[in-house]
Structures are given as C-alpha cells and as structure tokens.
A protein has these predicted regions:
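Glycine-rich phosphate/diphosphate-binding loop of Rossmann-like nucleotide-binding domains
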Residues: 159-213
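Solvent-exposed alpha-helices and their adjacent loops that cap or buttress functional pockets
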Residues: 7-11, 29, 83-86, 126-128, ...
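Flexible, glycine/charged-enriched surface loops at secondary-structure junctions
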Residues: 55-56, 81-86, 144-146, 204-208, ...
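Short, low-complexity N-terminal leaders and the immediately following helix N-cap/first helix
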Residues: 1-88
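Conserved small/polar residues in nucleotide/adenosyl-binding loops
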Residues: 331-332
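Short glycine/threonine-rich loop/turn motifs
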Residues: 179, 206-328
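Residue-level recognition of short, solvent-exposed, well-ordered loop/turn junctions
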Residues: 32, 38, 123, 127-130, ...
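Extended, charged alpha/beta regions that create polyanion-binding interfaces
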Residues: 59-167
Length: 332
C-alpha cells in the first residue's frame, strides 16, 4: 500500500472504499476497492476530501481490510447464519433461523485484545429472530500483517466463535399449586402469563394440574404430566420459605436433579431449576414472574427452548447484572 497525491493517481488501483457522506441523503461508497482511478474521478475524489489516496503496491506481506474481514467472518460464522457482502471493510453476520445465540466469550476477548481487529456481537444466551444481526467484523487499519491474522485464526482452534442453536418443539405441562387457587378463593392469573411467554416459541401445553399445598399430590401431578409426554414442566406457586409452600420439596421428590434452588436475580430469587432423567426440565417459578416485566424466567426460557443445559455455575454468575431494573441487558 502506498500513499499518493490524488492528482497523480490516475491509472492506479484504489486499495479501500471511498465513502461519501451527505447528511440526511447518503452514506455510501462512491468508489470501491479495486477501482482504477481515471482522470474524471479526480474532481469527485477531491470533493469528498481525498487530497491523497492509498493505492496498491504488489509484493506486500499484508492483507487488505476486506480480506481480513473475511478471515474474521470465517472465524465467527457458525451454522444457521450468513454474511452480508463486505462493505467498507466490514462484514456482518445475520441469523437464518429463530434460535439461541451462543458466544465464546473467552475467544472473542482474546481476538479483540490482539489489537488492529475487532469482533462485535450481541450478548450470548439471548433469543434471536431470523434476520437479526448477530455480529460485525473488521480490522481497524486499511491493511494488516498476514501473520497477525494467522495468529487470530489460531485462537479459534477449529471452532467458530458464534453458534446458533435452533429452538425445538416442547410439550409443556403446567402444575399450579396453592390452596387459594385450588379452593377457588382467587382466580389463577399465573397461567395466562406463562402461556403468553410460551407463545413466543414452538410449544404446546399438553396439560395443567391444579393442586393444593400437599407436596405428595404435587409430585404425583408432575410425574403424571411427564408420563403423558411433557418434556418441560413448569410449576407455579409455593416457591417461598413459608410453611405452606411445598413446591421445592415436591420437585425434589420426583427424583429430579436439582441444579439450583435460588438464583442471584431480582426479581426471581426463589427460582428453582432441575432436570428429570437428565433432560426434562422441571422449573419452579416464583410469584414475580406473574407481574414483573423481566425476571429470571425470561433469561432461562430461551436456553431451555434450545435444549441448552444451564449449570449452577452459570446461574451463580448472574449476580453481577442480576438486578433487572426492567431492562433486558443481563444474560446467562
């Protein structure tokens, strides 16, 4: 790459896009990388502030920004996503399906710490829709050493930085607990909220059982729904430490493995996550899910719907950022 006065660059090959910005009208390239500069181009280049331009010199051990962006794109792109055409040195990745975005945080941090290159992505472990932008890649200068890009590629170790897990169909069973609902003292306002959240995914509710505060009956209800084919059971009510609240004990008595009873998220501290036979989630939902805009359930549900198992360590990491404040920035 060589810097040359624009008036002297006729016949030379541009090594980067030349962008024209007119506020409220356009922001686009007037000349693309690889364009051979003509006499007629000189006034246009000068009008966009280019008194000097970078032109290609052969024999360099360097990569142009577009070529480097392709390498970064290849490092990031997993299944079910596609790239946009390279433009002004940048490539973006777009989702081909609805699913759960996974990001290798360690690898993206290592690449971004190398300097002269960047990968910007959405938060991992969030639901995305088909057509959503997932990430963008580019280098900072116009050219970069080939050797440096090879070092960046080595960070990936044959695995892409991004992956997109498709949501799967779930047959859902709902167990509603509490004497107040069972004996018709109050209306069940929890189940409509649950069904509304499930409507964002490929789900069918195959049954609902209403139980009083009898832990043996709750356990029996959970197991009966699993026998009917439920591959996700949601239990509402009875999740606090009050003496009449028996849902955590009932879930434990199914034989399910308890991942965690309690999560460092507000609202949602009394959340319970367990897996029956290692693969069927049984979830105890605290009352806040019924009225709060964002809770722990909104963070866990996308992962459950993609069969992405959640660990106790991942739940513990929610403490930083776990104060929801009705925002959607916290993530697992």
């Amino acid at each position: 790459m060589k810097l040359m006065k624009t008036q002297d660059a006729v016949g030379q090959v541009l090594c980067h896009d030349i962008t024209q910005i007119i506020k409220g009208v356009t922001k686009d390239a007037v000349f693309r990388k690889g364009h051979v500069i003509t006499e007629e181009d000189i006034p246009v280049l000068l009008s966009v502030g280019k008194d000097n331009v970078y032109i290609w010199e052969k024999g360099e051990k360097k990569l142009h920004e577009n070529e480097a962006a392709e390498i970064l794109r290849e490092m990031c792109q997993g299944e079910y996503m596609h790239p946009t055409p390279v433009k002004e040195g940048k490539i973006e990745l777009v989702a081909d399906i609805d699913g759960l975005l996974k990001v290798n945080s360690d690898k993206i941090k290592k690449v971004n710490s190398m300097g002269e290159m960047m990968i910007a992505s959405r938060h991992g472990n969030f639901a995305v829709k088909k057509g959503d932008k997932l990430a963008g890649t580019r280098i900072i200068p116009l050219v970069i050493e080939k050797e440096k890009m090879e070092s960046a590629k080595a960070v990936c170790e044959g695995q892409t930085i991004l992956s997109l897990k498709p949501f799967v169909h779930k047959k859902v069973g709902i167990v509603t607990t509490g004497n107040e609902v069972y004996y018709h003292r109050i209306e069940d306002t929890f189940t409509p909220v649950i069904k509304e959240k499930l409507a964002d995914y490929d789900t069918e509710v195959i049954g609902q059982v209403v139980c009083n505060d009898d832990h043996e009956k709750i356990t029996k209800a959970i197991l009966s729904l699993i026998e009917k084919g439920a591959d996700l059971v949601l239990c509402t009510g009875g999740m606090s430490v009050d003496p009449d609240d028996k849902t955590p004990l009932a879930i434990k008595n199914t034989g399910a493995k308890i991942v965690s009873y309690g999560a460092p998220v507000l609202p949602g501290a009394m959340f319970l996550l367990s897996y029956y036979n290692e693969d069927i989630p049984i979830v105890g939902l605290p009352g806040c899910v019924m009225y709060a805009k964002r809770t722990i359930f909104d963070l866990a549900l996308p992962r459950i719907m993609a069969d992405d198992k959640i660990t106790a360590e991942e739940l513990a990491e929610l403490g930083e950022g776990g104060l929801c404040l009705n925002l959607s920035l916290i993530h697992i």
